């Protein structure tokens, strides 16, 4: 027997583990990213947003409203969350808290101060499951993956012409103007460098720098010594030569006219404040903390000077008696030396250089209030040679200018701009690196907390405008913080965001995996993101920096492919929004298992990473001598001592859904993608069953799924039943956990919980108390283990169709329960009020058979389409009675009924058992919309057995539709009489290259024979030879093939067939939801054609192609009837009916309505369309008149 470990998964399940990974790190809370982000919003984001908007000054400057820092508090209930959420779901309300903050009013003249607490309205609160309950429905906010604020350099193609290349630099803030610096690098002539602010006209770089206050000589000195081998920088020289402005003031005036074109009122003050307001004003320009971090990292020396040679001696404390040589001229700069040089400048060991001519003009407006600004404009300057050849030829050195590494300001500084321009010219001399826009080094996650903060700021800015208007309209003495603060803008902003934003989604709750995946989804779309119509292939493609951060497999198949992604299993997001991946540190070939180290993509540069499957001894020493490691974009073979880090798990690369696919490494990536997506569509079955062949992540999903109840305080189980579990803690306090029973998800699937603990069990924090839908014994269980054969069967499994045994129907193997709500409102209007009643006019007793005395359906009733669920009559209004109604009223001496039947009926194509009825009424104290007096909600449960037309799939992207349910006696069987449950087409395997399903088949058969279970993680699963050995152990054929017998003939199949156990899923694409038929139904008002789709009770129209078919057969009369009488010629049809009834001649058909639509459209274009018959008649009249 091959050596293996027995590992425990969940409370009771043991599985054989043959994986090579020596030790893995336990998975953490899968919802940590969402929860952490929302906690930041409550703790810091709200306070930060209020500080950004306040103080608010009145228009006359006499009153200031200020926010008292850290006084904001969000009040909401956290105790007994289960009951609060259950009530909110029932009543269709939002789970929210009230936001309060303290504001002070200061009268400038007197200095009088008044403080008051004001309300900012309701803010939706995140539940413990990472969701928001909005109007009774669970929603989630999807995290956004967008380009980080910062500076980006690189070659760009303009006008989609490969020969039209531009060197381009973009400075992207979180708030404020975008700056673009560029010049053409193709063509025979030297192009000048241009600067573009937002979408304004481009100006010369020299003009821009001179407008900042730099003289031509300063520009030449700072950037002109960027030499090429020819000895001079031709691009800067050309730009300087073409500079047309004589003075800095002229340059500033021109820049002002470009930015404020059309504004002729140029004053000295407005000119001097121009750049200050656009780039250096914290209220108008904000890089954000992330942007400042990115800018400092980009403009630092480290990544720019690696591999170059020092062109000067570096001394510590230069210019003093204690000066000491640290690095000599000619030193090759490695990463280690580059980091030491950068740190030395940062810690003031090497001196920073002040920039002349800049600060006085740029900061003229701010110097009075903050004189220290001028002192901060310092930069790092270093002379280097790009390579050894340049150094040996003793050419002019290149000056590399970096910004002040101690900068923390969130707006741009002059030192930043100087360093950026330096970097730009350095790139011409091949010093520095172009940025990869698709790398995760340059992309960050905008979490739910930051998205809510942005919405809060938008709401506050509207509130600020409103407050200023109110202050202008009131006397100073009557202004108070309360009466000028209107909470509606903030409340409405949150409401709009949660109800209509692309990032706010109705939670996918088909099964627990779908729920967790939906919460861990990342999108590149949405505000500030990409557009699916214009996103290129490069943006959608897998990138090397995705490893351990973004799953390369799980993504949609349609137009969103590569734009909607999922976090990898162990990925985290740091405070700056960059995704981190965990690794164990390797020191001289020995793995440090103490604690994983989380690294961003930028921190991985130049490091070597080994895979988790390398051989390791009991002391953590790597025993494999030649190891394949990952470094940057390449794979190398190195010795153990050269390895820097090692993966913590083989699941590290993939998302949770992809990690749930066994033998993932044996499947083609396209099929693995389908397998990941289809697992999220698996319907919870009546009786869950865990897979015989799992990956190990199933137990982790159970542990962190909000569907299951988890122990919060250790103790002993003191009470268990189907509705609640009580746990008695050590201090004799009892905590009650309430179970869900027959609740339904957003998608109508069953949510139910079963206890898995017994009376007297000792439980600890984190232990599972229940199995929810799609869980079994503390493991995720989406499908069933069934006997599969790969064979053809009378052509019924052609083109991926599936043949199933009737046993699966009779034994309810794939039976599921679906619950749907139908709601009706009772309103009050001018015409009268809707009434709840059993006395409904013109309705048979059969349709009312299930109603109680009030007119509401009884719980437990079996209902079918058309049955009345809630009886409602509504006033007709001021309608005139028809002659028939008048006659009946005269005969029976009754007044004609003023009510019409508007009852709630079971939808077309639906049926089931009434599970629950809820009544909400204003009289009972429920909060309802205006004019709504009562709401009745009826829940109908439907038990669906598997049938022809339902879609099934395995976990390897092997999907198909059931084509026949064959009787058990007709299904092939093994020699021992075991009947096959499902027959799949063997031709579906080779071309799809998802061999994992075949390996699962054989291992599943062995698992059943040995009465054991296996775990086979992706990229660390069982190898083919190991499976053969296990089949031997189970005394099964090594090739996994068996003799099948055809029961119809009693003969054996000619060839042996692969037979085994595979885990199959029933997907949420059921024929009951799709099949539809109608006899009569609604028609489009304009074209008089039938509506389309099941949701609108639509039908089939005789369309263009059907018309061609009749034309081809020459069936002119049938064609004429179909296009006129039988279609949309309403008047013609009435005439036809009268003719047939009276026996008269059938009138000629009129013009079809759809033809009239065409003629009306042409009339709109001033074209009059007349038929040929009209012209003929006109011609005859003309001839008669001529003859006369």
From Swiss-Prot:
One of its GO terms (cellular component) is DNA-directed RNA polymerase complex. One of its GO terms (molecular function) is ribonucleoside binding. InterPro entries: DNA-dir_RNA_pol_bsu_ext_1_sf, DNA-dir_RNA_pol_bsu_external_1, DNA-dir_RNA_pol_su2, DNA-dir_RNAP_su2_dom, DNA-dir_RNAP_su2_hyb_sf, RNA_pol_bsu_bac, RNA_pol_bsu_CS, RNA_pol_bsu_protrusion. SUPFAM superfamilies: beta and beta-prime subunits of DNA dependent RNA-polymerase. Pfam families: RNA_pol_Rpb2_1, RNA_pol_Rpb2_2, RNA_pol_Rpb2_3, RNA_pol_Rpb2_45, RNA_pol_Rpb2_6, RNA_pol_Rpb2_7. The keyword Transferase applies. GO terms for biological process: DNA-templated transcription. It is an enzyme of class 2 (transferase). It comes from the Bacteria. Its EC number is 2.7.7.6. The keyword Ubl conjugation does not apply. Keywords: DNA-directed RNA polymerase, Nucleotidyltransferase, Transcription, Transferase. It catalyses: RNA(n) + a ribonucleoside 5'-triphosphate = RNA(n+1) + diphosphate. The RNAP catalytic core consists of 2 alpha, 1 beta, 1 beta' and 1 omega subunit. When a sigma factor is associated with the core the holoenzyme is formed, which can initiate transcription. NCBIfam families: PRK00405.1. Belongs to the RNA polymerase beta chain family. DNA-dependent RNA polymerase catalyzes the transcription of DNA into RNA using the four ribonucleoside triphosphates as substrates. This is DNA-directed RNA polymerase subunit beta. It comes from Mycoplasma mobile (strain ATCC 43663 / 163K / NCTC 11711) (Mesomycoplasma mobile). The gene is rpoB.
């Amino acid at each position: 027997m091959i050596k293996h470990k027995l590992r425990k998964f969940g409370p009771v399940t043991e599985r054989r583990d043959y994986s090579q990974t020596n030790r893995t790190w336990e998975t953490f809370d899968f919802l940590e990213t969402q929860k952490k982000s929302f906690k930041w919003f409550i703790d810091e984001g709200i306070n930060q947003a209020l500080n950004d908007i306040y103080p608010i000054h009145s228009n006359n400057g006499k009153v200031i409203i200020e926010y008292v820092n850290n006084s904001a508090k969000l009040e909401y209930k956290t105790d007994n969350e289960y009951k609060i959420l259950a009530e909110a779901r029932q009543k269709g309300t939002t789970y929210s808290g009230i936001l309060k903050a303290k504001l002070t009013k200061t009268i400038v003249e007197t200095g009088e101060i008044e403080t008051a607490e004001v309300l900012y309205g309701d803010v939706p609160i995140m539940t413990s499951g990472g969701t928001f309950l909005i109007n009774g429905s669970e929603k989630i906010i999807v995290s956004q993956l967008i380009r980080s604020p910062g500076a980006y350099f690189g070659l760009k193609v303009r006008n989609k012409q490969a020969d039209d290349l531009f060197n381009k630099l973009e400075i992207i803030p979180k708030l404020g103007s975008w700056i673009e610096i560029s010049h053409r690098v193709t063509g025979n002539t030297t192009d000048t460098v241009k600067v573009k602010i937002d979408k304004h006209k481009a100006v010369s770089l020299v003009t821009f720098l001179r407008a900042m206050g730099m003289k031509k000589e300063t520009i030449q000195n700072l950037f002109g010594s960027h030499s090429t081998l020819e000895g001079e920088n031709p691009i800067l020289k050309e730009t300087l030569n073409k500079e047309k402005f004589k003075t800095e003031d002229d340059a500033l005036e021109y820049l002002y006219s470009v930015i404020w074109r059309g504004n002729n009122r140029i004053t000295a003050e407005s000119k001097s404040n121009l750049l200050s307001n656009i780039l250096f004003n914290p209220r108008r320009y904000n890089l954000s903390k992330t942007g400042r971090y990115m800018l400092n990292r980009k403009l630092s020396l480290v990544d720019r000077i690696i591999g170059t040679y020092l062109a000067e001696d570096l001394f510590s404390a230069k210019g003093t008696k204690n000066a000491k040589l640290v690095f000599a001229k000619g030193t090759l700069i490695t990463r280690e030396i580059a980091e030491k040089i950068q740190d030395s400048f940062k810690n003031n060991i090497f001196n920073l250089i002040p920039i002349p001519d800049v600060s006085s003009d740029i900061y003229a407006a701010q110097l009075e209030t903050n004189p220290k600004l001028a002192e901060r404009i310092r930069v790092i300057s270093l002379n280097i040679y790009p390579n050894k050849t340049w150094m040996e030829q003793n050419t002019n050195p290149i000056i590399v200018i970096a910004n002040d590494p101690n900068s923390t300001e969130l707006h741009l500084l002059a030192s930043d701009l100087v360093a950026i321009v330096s970097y730009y010219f350095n790139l011409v001399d091949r010093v520095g690196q172009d940025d990869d826009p698709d790398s995760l080094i340059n992309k960050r996650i905008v979490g739910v907390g930051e998205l809510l903060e942005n919405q809060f700021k938008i709401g506050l800015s509207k509130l600020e405008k409103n407050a200023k208007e109110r202050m202008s309209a009131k006397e100073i003495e009557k202004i108070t913080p309360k009466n000028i603060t209107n909470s509606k803008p903030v409340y409405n902003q949150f409401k709009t965001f949660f109800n209509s934003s692309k990032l706010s989604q109705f939670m996918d709750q088909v099964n627990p995996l779908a729920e967790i995946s939906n919460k861990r989804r990342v999108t590149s779309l949405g505000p500030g993101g990409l557009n699916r119509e214009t996103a290129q292939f490069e943006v959608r493609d897998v990138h090397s920096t995705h490893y351990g951060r973004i799953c390369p497999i799980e993504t949609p198949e349609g137009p969103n492919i590569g734009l909607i992604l999922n976090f990898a299993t162990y990925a985290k997001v740091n405070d700056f929004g960059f995704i981190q991946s965990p690794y164990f540190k390797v020191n001289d070939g020995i793995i440090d298992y103490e604690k994983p180290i989380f690294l961003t993509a930028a921190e991985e540069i130049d490091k070597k990473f080994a895979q988790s499957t390398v051989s390791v001894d009991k002391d953590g020493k790597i025993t494999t001598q030649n190891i394949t490691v990952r470094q940057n974009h390449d794979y190398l073979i190195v010795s153990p001592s050269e390895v820097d880090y090692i993966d913590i798990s083989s699941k590290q690369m993939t998302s949770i859904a992809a990690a749930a696919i066994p033998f993932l490494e044996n499947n083609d990536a396209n099929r693995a993608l389908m397998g990941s997506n289809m697992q999220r569509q698996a319907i919870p079955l009546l009786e869950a069953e865990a897979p015989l062949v799992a990956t190990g992540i199933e137990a982790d999903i159970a542990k962190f799924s909000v569907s299951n109840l988890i122990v919060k305080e250790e103790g002993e189980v003191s009470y268990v039943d189907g509705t609640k579990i009580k746990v008695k803690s050590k201090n004799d306090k009892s905590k009650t956990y309430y179970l869900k029973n027959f609740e339904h998800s957003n998608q109508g699937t069953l949510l139910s919980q079963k206890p898995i603990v017994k009376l007297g069990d000792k439980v600890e924090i984190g232990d599972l108390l229940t199995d929810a839908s799609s869980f079994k014994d503390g493991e995720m269980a989406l499908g069933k283990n069934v006997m599969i054969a790969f064979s053809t069967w009378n052509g019924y499994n052609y083109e991926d169709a599936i043949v199933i045994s009737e046993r699966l129907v009779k034994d309810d193997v794939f039976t599921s329960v679906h619950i749907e709500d139908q709601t009706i409102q009772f309103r009050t209007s001018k015409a009268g009020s809707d009434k709840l009643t059993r006395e409904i006019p013109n309705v048979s007793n059969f349709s009312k058979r299930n109603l109680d005395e009030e007119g509401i359906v009884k719980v437990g009733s079996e209902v079918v389409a058309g049955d009345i669920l809630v009886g409602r009559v509504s006033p007709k209004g001021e309608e005139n009675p028809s002659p028939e109604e008048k006659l009946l009223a005269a005969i029976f001496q009754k007044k004609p009924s003023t009510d019409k039947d508007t009852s709630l009926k079971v939808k077309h194509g639906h049926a089931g058992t009434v599970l629950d009825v809820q009544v909400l009424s204003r009289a009972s104290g429920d909060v309802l919309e205006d004019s709504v007096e009562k709401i009745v909600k009826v829940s109908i449960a439907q038990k669906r057995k598997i049938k022809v037309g339902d879609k099934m799939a395995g976990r390897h992207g092997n999907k198909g539709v059931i084509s026949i349910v064959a009787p058990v006696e007709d299904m092939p069987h093994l020699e021992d009489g075991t009947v096959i449950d499902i027959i799949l087409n063997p031709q579906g395997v080779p071309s799809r290259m998802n061999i994992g399903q075949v390996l699962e088949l054989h291992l599943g058969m062995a698992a059943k024979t040995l009465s054991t279970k296996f775990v086979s993680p992706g990229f660390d699963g069982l190898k083919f030879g190991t499976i053969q050995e296990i089949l031997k152990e189970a005394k099964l054929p090594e090739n996994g093939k068996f003799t099948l017998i055809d029961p119809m003939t009693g003969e054996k199949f000619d060839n042996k067939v692969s037979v085994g156990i595979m885990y199959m899923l029933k997907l949420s694409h059921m024929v009951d939801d799709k099949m539809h038929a109608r006899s009569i139904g609604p028609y489009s008002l304009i074209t008089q054609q039938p509506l389309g789709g099941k949701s609108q009770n639509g039908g089939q129209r005789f369309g263009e192609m059907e018309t061609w078919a009749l034309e081809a057969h020459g069936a002119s009369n049938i064609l004429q009837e179909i296009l006129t009488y039988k279609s949309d010629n309403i008047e013609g049809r009435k005439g036809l009916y009268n003719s047939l009834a009276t026996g008269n001649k059938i009138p000629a058909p009129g013009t079809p309505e759809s033809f009239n639509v065409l003629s009306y459209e042409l009339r709109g274009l001033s074209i009059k369309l007349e038929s040929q018959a009209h012209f003929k008649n006109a011609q005859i009249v003309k001839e008669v008149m001529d003859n006369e």
